[in-house]
Amino acid sequence: PTETQLKQELKQAESSKNAPNQAETTEALQSALNWLAERKESQTRSEQYQKVIDDFPKMTQELRRQLVLESNKILPNGDDLPAAELEQQILQTSSLLLEQARLLQQEQDHTREISDSLGQLPQQQTDARRALTEVQRRLQAQPANPTTPYAQAALALLQTEAAARKAKVDELELA
C-alpha cells in the first residue's frame, strides 16, 4: 500500500469510532505509515551509498591530481624577503598547519567511527535478514483477502514492515 492509501484508511478508521477493533486498526495503520517512513530513509541512505561508490574513482582521481599540484608547488626560499614578510609567512604557515592538524584529527575520528561500524556490520546484516525472514513468514500466514478493516490494516502493516526490512537489508549490503 502507498502512503496516500494508508493515510486515507487511517482517516477512515479514526472517524469510525464505533467500529470493532477501531483502536487496533488505527494503531496498525499508524505503524504501517511509520514502516513506510523507515523504508524511505533506508532507500535514501542506499542511494547515498551508491552515489559514493559510483563517485569514488572520480574522487580519488581528483585527490591525486590535487596532491600532484601541491607537491609541484615551488615555495620561496626566503633569501630575498624582508624579515617581517618571512615572519608573516611563518605565521600563515603555522596557522595553516594547525588547521590541517585539526582537519586530520576530524578525519581520523571519522575513520575510527567507520571502522567501528564496519565491525558491527555483519551482525547488523544477520539481524536484518533474520527480521526480514520473520516478517515474511508472518505475512505468508495472513489470509490473502482480509475481510475486516482490522485484518486489512494488519496485512498492510506486515506488507510495509516487510518492505522496510527489505530496504534495510539492501542498505546494509551496500554499506
At which residue positions do the language-model features occur?
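Flexible, low-complexity extramembrane segments of multi-pass membrane transporters/channels
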Residues: 1-175
